[in-house]
Amino acid sequence: MKAILHKANTRGHANHGWLNAYHSFSFASWYNPERVQFGVLRVLNDDTVAAGMGFGTHPHDNMEIITIPLEGDLAHKDSMGNESIIKTGDVQVMSAGTGIQHSEFNPNADLQTKLFQIWLFPKYRNVVPRYQQITLDIAKQKNNFAQILSPNEEDEGVWIYQDAWFHLADFDKDFSKTYEIKKAGNGIYVFVISGTITVNGQELETRDGFGIWDFNKLE
């Protein structure tokens, strides 16, 4: 087994007033040559957006972009004609492909929005852009690895143009579970939203990241 530990306090940080962002991988003005990507995982941003504020219209291409709200809502609008509110408990994905433009705003006047935005390099370049949003069954995450994303349109969760799988889990104290890799040769990146867990002997705390490869299962 090979592994790399990203402690929460080693992440990049930028506070723009309206946006307080922590970067697990190099992003914008924060660059760490040892923290550019983990496999196809390019961006893992932990964002807090102030009430009534947000990201103006901006472009993307050839990237799989996943948004997971943790608290509050996010209003989305894009050049494909999609307009939606992404709520806590939802997951949204955009395959940017040949190119899209979109904006994201906190629609609430008095509540902040917290979210993860995750970017993955695509398996195929210049695909037709697509959008998908679903509401998750939170109960499935209790003491279980609930799949929320995969490469398969027919599978549970949203799907993307990449051989990657996302799972969310909410474990009770002293609960133990084994995770088996989905595809030979893939690695796994574990990110702790809240609490303390032990993964293959490594203790992880809130907002720590842990990348593992050359292994068969996770305990």
Question: What are the residue ranges of the model-derived segments?
Answer:
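A short glycine-rich, His/Asp/Glu-containing loop-to-beta-strand
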Residues: 15-59, 63-64, 115, 137-180
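A short secondary-structure junction signal
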Residues: 103-105, 126-134, 157-161, 179-181
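Short beta-strand segments
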Residues: 44-45, 69, 95, 119-121, ...
